[in-house]
Amino acid sequence: MDLPYYHGCLTKRECEALLLKGGVDGNFLIRDSESVPGALCLCVSFKKLVYSYRIFREKHGYYRIETDAHTPRTIFPNLQELVSKYGKPGQGLVVHLSNPIMRNNLCQRGRRMELELNVYENTDEEYVDVLP
């Protein structure tokens, strides 16, 4: 995902530290959900707390966010439009999204997994001739 505020597999704790660091209401980022496989979390800071809203991928690649019960269900063609809508006050979040927290690099989990898989790959230099 090529969004500068998408942090991949950032943990909830790491997310909270990043969002609360500046003490600014409206800091936000998107990360992978730790508890719901395939879901994302839109996390936003407000009054020294972090609020998380789950984002689900619907049919045909659309996105749906879970906000409060009084907000009509809206489906978005992409995450940029979702963020754009919730960047305006009074759209159903505890506070509007005002300050994206940009990632330094994506999560290392995928890279770690790739490295672990590479341990079992052999190169020609690792082969030993076996005599009959």
Swiss-Prot record:
Q: How is it modified after translation?
A: Phosphorylated on tyrosine residues; probably at Tyr-120 and/or Tyr-127.
Outcome when changing residue 120 to F? Abolishes tyrosine phosphorylation, no effect on interaction with SLAMF7 and CD244, abolishes SLAMF7-, CD244-, LY9- and CD8 mediated NK cell activation, fails to inhibit natural cytotoxicity and to suppress IFN-gamma secretion in response to ligation with CD244, FCGR3 or KLRB1C
Modification sites for Phosphotyrosine: 127
**Tissue expression pattern:** Expressed in spleen, thymus, lung, kidney, heart, colon and small bowel. Expressed in NK cells (all stages of cell maturation), macrophages and dendritic cells.
Q: Which residues form the SH2 domain?
A: 5-101
GO BP terms: namely: adaptive immune response; leukocyte activation involved in immune response; natural killer cell inhibitory signaling pathway; natural killer cell mediated cytotoxicity; negative regulation of natural killer cell mediated cytotoxicity; negative regulation of type II interferon production; positive regulation of innate immune response; positive regulation of natural killer cell mediated cytotoxicity
Subunit structure as annotated in this protein's UniProt entry: Binds to the phosphorylated receptors CD84, SLAMF1, LY9 and CD244. Does not bind to non-phosphorylated SLAMF1. Interacts with SLAMF7 (via ITSM phosphorylated on 'Tyr-302'). Interacts with Src kinases HCK, LYN, FYN, FGR and LCK (via kinase domains). Interacts (phosphorylated at Tyr-127) with PLCG2.
What job does this protein perform?
Cytoplasmic adapter regulating receptors of the signaling lymphocytic activation molecule (SLAM) family such as CD84, SLAMF1, LY9 and CD244. In SLAM signaling seems to cooperate with SH2D1A/SAP. Plays a role in regulation of effector functions of natural killer (NK) cells by controlling signal transduction through CD244/2B4. However, conflicting results are reported which may reflect the use of different strain backgrounds.
What is the protein name for this chain?
Answer: SH2 domain-containing protein 1B
Q: Please tell me the species this chain comes from.
A: Mus musculus
Source species taxonomy: Eukaryota, Metazoa, Chordata, Craniata, Vertebrata
Query: Gene name?
Result: Sh2d1b
